A protein has these predicted regions:
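Short beta-strand element of the alpha/beta-hydrolase
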Residues: 13-22
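The serine-hydrolase catalytic nucleophile loop
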Residues: 24-36, 49
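Cap/lid segment of the alpha/beta-hydrolase catalytic domain
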Residues: 50-71, 136
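Alpha/beta-hydrolase active-site loop
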Residues: 64-90
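Alpha/beta-hydrolase fold nucleophile elbow
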Residues: 89-104
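Hydrolase active-site cap/lid region
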Residues: 109-151
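The feature captures the conserved acid-bearing segment of alpha/beta-hydrolase catalytic domains
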Residues: 133-198
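C-terminal catalytic histidine-bearing segment of alpha/beta-hydrolase fold enzymes
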Residues: 198-251
């Protein structure tokens, strides 16, 4: 599977993040994100979503193929973990400290994967939702342009699989005026998830939501515009706090 790999030194075991980009872009988008992680002592493992980047199939750039894309990539995440444990990498990707994250469609896949047994220590998503039923039902803020089979939506909808969601630290970043993925759906999902944490005896404060208003980003959806630096700093701080990387050696 095509992947962009980055590591603080390629010698010392380091925690890492599997990152899933959004629809219509590719794994090379936003290299500054990966550079920040590496400088903080965290490895980056960014993969192309099905039909994107080096796996190009233009049909997968259409909203009509989103469910196919999500279904496929959720099933591929364990393949990525297995590949990183191969001898050729010399154990530099610490299998005891993996994290996962994604933006928009990549965040949806991230949240669905977390509803099944997994090894991840923490997760970070942005501009996404865990309530696909609400997203595809449309809303005054964002009527969805494609009608999907409700049964297929339910299969990949994190909100329909919360019973399997093991409490871990979760950071969600969102623009309050997001026109593609309205924040209301994510707020409702996170509240349901907090209740799930409570029932499991976990602290609901493990779930963090950071919002940004009037970012200036296209459709208030991608990159957080004038707050992009703040968003990236918040994400790095969260990852460092929970993955406990060793800072790269000076020089």
């Amino acid at each position: 599977m095509p992947a962009l790999l980055a590591h603080p030194d390629w010698e010392t075991p380091a925690p890492f993040v599997i990152w899933l980009h959004g629809r219509t872009v590719n794994k090379e988008l936003d290299p500054g994100r990966y550079l920040r992680w590496v400088r903080a002592g965290i490895g980056a493992v960014a993969i192309d979503l099905p039909g994107h980047g080096e796996r190009l199939d233009p049909a997968y750039h259409s909203p009509a193929k989103t469910l196919d894309m999500l279904t496929q990539v959720v099933g591929e995440i364990d393949e990525v973990l297995d590949a990183l444990a191969a001898p050729e990498y010399g154990e530099v990707f610490d299998q005891e400290r993996p994290a996962i994250g994604g933006m928009s469609a990549g965040g949806m896949a991230t949240l669905r994967r977390l509803c099944d047994p997994h090894p991840f220590v923490c997760a970070a998503v942005e501009g996404t939702t865990g309530d696909l039923g609400a997203l595809y039902a449309g809303s005054p803020e964002r009527p969805w342009p494609v009608t999907h089979d409700p049964a297929r939506v339910a299969a990949v909808d994190p909100a329909r699989h919360l019973d399997g969601f093991r409490p871990i630290p979760l950071l969600a970043l969102h623009a309050t005026g997001d026109q593609m993925v309205p924040i209301a759906g994510m707020q409702g999902f996170l509240e349901a998830l907090r209740e799930r944490y409570r029932h499991q005896g976990a602290d609901p404060a493990m779930i963090e939501l950071r919002t940004f208003t009037d970012t200036g980003a296209p459709q208030e959806h991608a990159g957080f515009g004038r707050y992009g630096n703040d968003a990236k700093n918040a994400q790095v701080e969260f990852l460092v706090r929970h993955l406990r990387p060793a800072p790269p050696a000076a020089g």
